[in-house]
Design a protein with these regions (language model features):
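Alpha/beta enzyme core
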Residues: 1-126, 130-166
Length: 167
């Protein structure tokens, strides 16, 4: 399986190239996924490629955001705004929510949606996962999979050479 992150600006050029190269999964990577841009991007991908490629949307922090992305056609939804180690969305836009609260609400919305439609939408917990037990907590709260940057960034092991910048 091959995945790629895209944005909501040049997707009409990038997505065809990625699909032609063999990508299986796309995610519209945005700090605030509850937007018309993301909705239009997901709709275009689903209308153009249908089930040929899976597409995820996010990030959202509540039921309304989850349902908005699902209505657009998202195959999975990323949850979390402001909890990531390099995220500045809370400071820049004044939005965000505690990761546990956001994850619980979105997973409850997902369960309600599943009970109404029979369609299960996987949830990715993205942000704020620092320690080992945070992974267990996120999965116990309903996440199907996790996105982690800070956790792995602290290790010396890497598939590439270490690059020292500055002092």
């Amino acid at each position: 399986m091959v995945g790629a992150g895209i944005n909501s600006r040049d997707f009409k050029e990038r997505v065809p190239a990625l699909v032609d190269a063999g990508v299986d999964v796309l995610v519209v990577d945005s700090s605030d996924g509850f937007s018309e841009w993301q909705y239009e991007t997901i709709r275009w991908i689903k209308e153009t490629y249908n089930e040929e490629v899976k597409v995820g949307g996010g990030n959202v922090v509540d039921k309304e955001g989850f349902l908005y992305l699902v209505k657009a056609g998202a195959d999975f939804v990323k949850v979390g705004i402001g909890g990531g180690s390099i995220c500045i969305t809370r400071e820049q836009k004044g939005i965000g929510r505690g990761q546990a609260t956001a994850l619980i609400e979105v997973c409850q919305a997902r369960q309600e949606y599943f009970e109404q439609t029979g369609i299960y939408i996987p949830i990715c917990s993205d942000g704020g996962l620092v320690h080992d037990y945070h992974m267990t907590l996120a999965l116990a709260m309903g996440a199907d999979f996790l996105m982690m940057g800070r956790y792995f960034a602290r290790f010396d092991e890497s598939p590439s050479k270490k690059l020292a910048i500055g002092n």
